[in-house]
Amino acid sequence: MSTRNDVHLGHKARKRFGQNFLNDPYVIDGIVSAINPLPGQNLVEIGPGLGAITEPVGREVDKFTVIELDRDLAERLRNHPELGSKLTIHEGDAMRFDFTQLIKENNKLRIFGNLPYNISTPLMFHLFEFHKDVQDMHFMLQKEVVNRLAAGPGTKAYGRLTVMAQYFCKVMPVLEVPPTAFVPPPKVDSAVVRLVPYETLPYPATNLKWLDRVCREGFNQRRKTVRNCYKALLTKEQLEELGINPSMRPENLTLEQFVNMANWLDANHSAE
């Protein structure tokens, strides 16, 4: 067996795909327990890789879907003695994948995966677009990204990703994972998070473009006052009418306050 630390089960990890293969049985068991896959559910794995999570999930269910960009790995799964007949394999990029094609009536998507860390944030933004059709999502991510997803106002980790994730989903960190659980070991700690989209959004925005804009502008200038940060969009009086203290910093605004600003702007400005 090779002594290289980037070869696992005969497959060399590809840097351009951000591949790190999970190989710690304790961690794998923890993830599968958190997902709790049941027969008949509409399960979708993103980036199954060498099947560390795919195999134990396959022991619990009859059929599920996987999306894999690496052709060699997709081929391996196709020829897998136990999984081959259970899997529907989509070869391609999850960032461009239209998840509506997997929707089944009264059977929402349950999405999971050990996401390549180099695309995890844009991929989550892509997945949020399908929130109405998703029951839950379980992802292995960089621990720092999980901290950002779960952060509260006023903390260093709080940012645009936090606000947009918490707009769509309840966020629950599940499990911390050390680099030694992977081949090759990544240079960062990892963690598993559960994202559960709301049936009814707690603070609905009338136009997501405005919400995205106030988040971007706020977090790009997080140390400025709200008044200075948004002076091209809202006056001090308008902010006060919305219950927002003009002298606070954008990093201290709550999700509800960001949505209130976005909805006011949508009603009173044409989006630029």
Swiss-Prot record:
Protein name: Ribosomal RNA small subunit methyltransferase A
Origin superkingdom: Bacteria
Entry-linked HAMAP family: 16SrRNA_methyltr_A (MF_00607)
Catalyzed reactions: adenosine(1518)/adenosine(1519) in 16S rRNA + 4 S-adenosyl-L-methionine = N(6)-dimethyladenosine(1518)/N(6)-dimethyladenosine(1519) in 16S rRNA + 4 S-adenosyl-L-homocysteine + 4 H(+)
Family under the similarity heading: Belongs to the class I-like SAM-binding methyltransferase superfamily. rRNA adenine N(6)-methyltransferase family. RsmA subfamily.
PROSITE patterns (UniProt xref): RRNA_A_DIMETH (PS01131), SAM_RNA_A_N6_MT (PS51689)
Cellular component GO terms, alphabetical: cytosol
NCBIfam families: ksgA
Disulfide bonds: none
Predominant cellular place of this UniProt entry's protein: cytoplasm
Binding, S-adenosyl-L-methionine: 20, 22, 47, 68, 93, 114
Keywords noted in UniProt: Cytoplasm, Methyltransferase, RNA-binding, rRNA processing, S-adenosyl-L-methionine, Transferase
Cell location: Cytoplasm
Residue ranges that the Swiss-Prot or TrEMBL entry lists as coiled coil: none
UniProt key word Repressor: no
PANTHER family linked to this entry: DIMETHYLADENOSINE TRANSFERASE (PTHR11727), DIMETHYLADENOSINE TRANSFERASE-RELATED (PTHR11727:SF7)
InterPro entries: KsgA/Erm, rRNA_Ade_diMease-like_C, rRNA_Ade_Mease_Trfase_CS, rRNA_Ade_methylase_Trfase_N, rRNA_adenine_dimethylase, SAM-dependent_MTases_sf
Listed Pfam families: RrnaAD
Function: Specifically dimethylates two adjacent adenosines (A1518 and A1519) in the loop of a conserved hairpin near the 3'-end of 16S rRNA in the 30S particle. May play a critical role in biogenesis of 30S subunits.
GO molecular function: 16S rRNA (adenine(1518)-N(6)/adenine(1519)-N(6))-dimethyltransferase activity; RNA binding
Enzyme Commission number(s) from the entry: 2.1.1.182
